[in-house]
């Protein structure tokens, strides 16, 4: 989630502090967590909180700092199918389980009675790397589909029943954009930048809601207070106008008061999040 905005933050911050240099790479939440744990980077970021096992394996305490709210969109590329597709959780789960294989499947047609759905094969595109985006998306599917929860579950790395893997949000975005019949899940900014069509998703209120600043903010607004470790989940929360696949993205900050690089990181975060 955080890569598009954090690179903008770096650029703006360096205008005020030219002594600081940043080298940030979008390698997926799984890769970011591994680098933080191996202490090869000064800080990291993740779209899925570190597990208790991961935190216990850290050489130094690590704080989760919620930095932004984002959303996982369901992007598609189908010739003749204009923007405005609606999907509910059960249908999404069945697509990614490999049970719904045609775009004119009755389950899709029932939700989209006015859409001209072609008999095109559905190509599922999913992440091949350890991914917080995958964790967010699979957590949503596990919440709305008993079959998905029992057969696949949720996490940064899961055993996909079907589909072609691509690396990073960038890879999934590119694969969907160039393939007729493709469907995949990507962070909102990537869908917008690539001008991909995205589906409106059914929330707990029964509303079909598109991902937007407003609908993501509404998801965050349902959270009245943070837990002590700041790792609260707002995926599929109940609220009017909520986009159901919304989530925080966290900065992972090792605790080492004597570290000069970490002092610089804390100063940057104080500027970025004030």
Task: List PLM regions with ranges.
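Flexible loop/hinge segments at secondary-structure junctions
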Residues: 1-274
């Amino acid at each position: 989630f955080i890569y598009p905005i954090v690179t903008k933050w770096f650029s703006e911050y360096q205008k005020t502090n030219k002594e600081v240099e940043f080298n940030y790479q979008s390698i997926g939440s799984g890769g970011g967590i591994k680098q933080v744990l191996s202490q090869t980077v000064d800080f990291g970021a993740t779209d899925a909180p570190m597990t208790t096992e991961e935190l216990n394996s850290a050489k130094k305490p690590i704080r989760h700092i919620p930095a932004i709210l984002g959303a996982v969109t369901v992007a598609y590329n189908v010739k003749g199918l204009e923007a405005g597709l609606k999907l509910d959780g059960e249908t999404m789960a069945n697509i990614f389980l490999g049970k719904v294989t045609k775009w004119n499947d009755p389950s899709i047609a029932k939700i989209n009675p006015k859409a001209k759905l072609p008999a095109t094969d559905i190509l599922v595109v999913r992440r091949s790397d350890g991914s917080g985006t995958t964790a967010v998306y699979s957590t949503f599917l596990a919440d709305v589909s008993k079959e998905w929860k029992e057969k696949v579950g949720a996490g940064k790395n899961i055993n996909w029943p079907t589909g072609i893997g691509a690396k990073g949000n960038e890879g999934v975005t590119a694969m969907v954009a160039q393939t007729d019949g493709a469907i995949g899940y990507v962070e909102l900014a990537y869908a917008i930048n690539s001008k991909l069509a995205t589906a409106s998703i059914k929330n707990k209120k029964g509303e079909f809601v598109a991902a937007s600043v407003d609908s993501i903010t509404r998801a965050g607004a349902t959270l009245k207070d943070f837990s002590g470790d700041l790792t609260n989940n707002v995926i599929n929360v109940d609220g009017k106008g909520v986009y159901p696949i919304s989530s925080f993205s966290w900065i992972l900050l090792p605790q080492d008061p004597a570290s000069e690089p970490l002092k610089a990181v804390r100063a940057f975060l104080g500027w970025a999040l004030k």
